[in-house]
């Protein structure tokens, strides 16, 4: 983890964890991974160090969490604030994060498909339907939007429009697919 050599423009915050018999470090780590997606991780015997966007460094130990980030970066400031909120939430509540095994088992593509289908349901209401097992791929869920004589077919596994007989509907469906892809992408 390479951080800038000049630390004069960096902010450092240390939060002591209230260890009332419960180790929250693993929960915090899982919360951060679930929220920010790709992060650089280095583990030592006493602590786990995380680096996000090459700027925000988080060191998690059994008794405290240290966060260091560049003051002038709004994105880094937002990430640091989010981590502080996670710590406060974890200290104040029971376990509300997926376990590590559940996190590994969770299929991100299934979640993305469900979120996209929900987005299409919100946009098109009863005009949207899910068609299961179309063609050779029986486990692939496709969807269709039918408005009058216009029909669009969407392949949710590839997040692409398969067929559409109306240019205005095609534009709207492609726009919603684009928005859906952005909404289901991790923050960093």
UniProtKB/Swiss-Prot annotation:
Going by the entry's taxonomy, the superkingdom of the source organism is recorded as Eukaryota
List the keywords (alphabetical).
Answer: mRNA processing, Nucleus
InterPro entries in the record: CPSF73-100_C (IPR021718)
Q: What is this protein called?
A: Protein SYC1
**Main localisation, per the record?**
nucleus
Query: Any other comment in the entry?
Result: Present with 1430 molecules/cell in log phase SD medium.
List the molecular function annotations (GO) for this entry.
RNA binding
Q: Would the keyword Nucleus be found if you checked this record's keyword annotation?
A: yes
Provide the taxonomic classification.
Eukaryota, Fungi, Dikarya, Ascomycota, Saccharomycotina
Which Pfam families does the record cross-reference, listed alphabetically?
Answer: CPSF73-100_C
**Compartment(s):** Nucleus
Please tell me whether the keyword Manganese is annotated for this protein: no
For biological process, the GO terms are:
mRNA processing; negative regulation of mRNA 3'-end processing; termination of RNA polymerase II transcription, poly(A)-coupled
Partners and quaternary state?
Component of the cleavage and polyadenylation factor (CPF) complex, which is composed of at least PTI1, SYC1, SSU72, GLC7, MPE1, REF2, PFS2, PTA1, YSH1/BRR5, SWD2, CFT2/YDH1, YTH1, CFT1/YHH1, FIP1 and PAP1. Component of the APT complex, which is a subcomplex of CPF, and is composed of PTI1, SYC1, SSU72, GLC7, REF2, PTA1 and SWD2.
The role this protein plays is: Component of the cleavage and polyadenylation factor (CPF) complex, which plays a key role in polyadenylation-dependent pre-mRNA 3'-end formation and cooperates with cleavage factors including the CFIA complex and NAB4/CFIB. Component of the APT complex, which may be involved in polyadenylation-independent transcript 3'-end formation, including snoRNAs and snRNAs.
GO CC terms in record? mRNA cleavage and polyadenylation specificity factor complex; nucleus
């Amino acid at each position: 983890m390479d951080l800038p050599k000049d630390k004069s423009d960096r902010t450092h915050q240390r939060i002591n964890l209230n260890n009332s018999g419960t180790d929250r470090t693993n929960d915090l780590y899982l919360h951060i991974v679930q929220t920010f997606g790709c992060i650089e991780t280095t583990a030592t015997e006493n602590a786990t160090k995380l680096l996000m966007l090459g700027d925000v460094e988080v060191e998690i130990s059994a008794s405290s969490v240290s966060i260091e980030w560049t003051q002038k970066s709004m994105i880094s400031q937002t990430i640091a604030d989010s981590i502080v909120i996670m710590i406060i939430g974890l200290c104040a509540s029971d376990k509300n994060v997926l376990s590590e095994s559940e996190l590994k088992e969770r299929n991100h593509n299934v979640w993305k498909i469900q979120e996209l289908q929900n987005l299409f349901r919100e946009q098109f209401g009863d005009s949207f339907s899910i068609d299961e097992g179309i063609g050779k791929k029986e486990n692939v869920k496709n969807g269709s939007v039918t408005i009058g004589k216009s029909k669009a077919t969407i392949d949710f596994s590839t997040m692409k429009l398969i067929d559409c007989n109306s240019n205005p509907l095609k534009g709207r469906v492609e726009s919603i697919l684009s928005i859906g892809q952005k909404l289901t992408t991790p923050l960093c």
